[in-house]
Amino acid sequence: MKTILRPFTLLSRSIFLALFVLFLWSPDAHAMHIMEGFLPPSWSLFWWVLTLPFLVVGFRSLRKIVDANPRMKLLLAMAGAFAFVLSSLKIPSVTGSCSHPTGVGLGAVLFGPSVMSVLGVIVLLFQALLLAHGGLTTLGANAFSMAIAGPFVSYGIYRLMVMSKAPEWLAVFLAAAIGDLMTYVVTSLQLALAFPSVTGGIAASLGKFMTIFALTQVPLAISEGILTVMVFSAIREYASELFPASGTLAKEGV
């Protein structure tokens, strides 16, 4: 059990260090995470129920990676801190809302989506408790969009590009960018399901929510893709001995 918790300790330290930076610069805007108490209780419970099985699988994958190579704990913590910092940067939107990167693509590519789901939930929990981003009742919904849907789409895109013999930088870029966008698509769907339009129903609400975030999220996704490629390349160069010939542990960490 101690072996499993060690990466969480490193992740906690990394997150607390990042908090100092975020508290020094924090724009006056609400984070894109669904805020505490915003969803009806039935929908909050629904998303929690969908999220829990992924966490169980994620814990098993995480334990498998740590047991195989304890030196991976530092990179696991770094992947979590990367997601924490990026998803805490709130960018105001001209539509009156705000958007932010997610940072989950890096961990999904390196370790697989199941592991990133656990790291993502930890990130969201810290943000809810320490930064008032999101909330505890909506943690299941936020986790499903950012810690599950985003990483699984990122992983799927990455594997698809690798199998098609695409350049690695392109595979990582598309994985991070499309995974970021998918997080917002799922969040928009969650809001549309909970608050359907009186006239157009769920479809109208979905279009409205997606339009609100599209103006800022598309350029943010591109920027996140570029940054993720840079960080991934640095990891491959300076920590290549920790990874198999494929360059990632994604297959082992699914």
UniProtKB/Swiss-Prot annotation:
One Pfam match, given by its short name, reads CbiM
Q: Name one GO biological process term.
A: cobalamin biosynthetic process
Record InterPro entries = CbiM (IPR018024), CbiM/NikMN (IPR002751)
Membrane topology designation: Multi-pass membrane protein
* GO CC field: ATP-binding cassette (ABC) transporter complex
- Record note on quaternary structure: Forms an energy-coupling factor (ECF) transporter complex composed of an ATP-binding protein (A component, CbiO), a transmembrane protein (T component, CbiQ) and 2 possible substrate-capture proteins (S components, CbiM and CbiN) of unknown stoichimetry.
Q: What is this protein called?
A: Cobalt transport protein CbiM
Species this chain originates from? Chlorobium limicola (strain DSM 245 / NBRC 103803 / 6330)
